[in-house]
Amino acid sequence: MPKKLKILRVQKGLSQAQLAKDLGTTQKTVSSWETGRATPRPPMMQKIADFFGVKKDDIFFEAFNYFK
């Protein structure tokens, strides 16, 4: 999840602070998601997926411990 979130953010040309503002959270929180120190709660996962226009599983696959 951390790498996928950062890749999506960078592809969209956003800083952590800009993404945090768009999602209604803090830059510190976005940083903790990207480094793997924290995982967003399910409602925020959906908000992030909607923001980037992707499915939750595409970003948070590892957070759910899914196996393909």
Locate predicted features.
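A short, Lys/Arg-rich alpha-helix, primarily the initiator
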Residues: 1-11
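Short, charged recognition helix plus adjacent turn
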Residues: 11, 50, 58-68
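Residues in the recognition helix of alpha-helical DNA-binding motifs
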Residues: 8, 22, 33, 62
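Short, low-complexity interaction segments enriched in Ser/Thr/Pro/Gly
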Residues: 1-3, 18, 25, 53
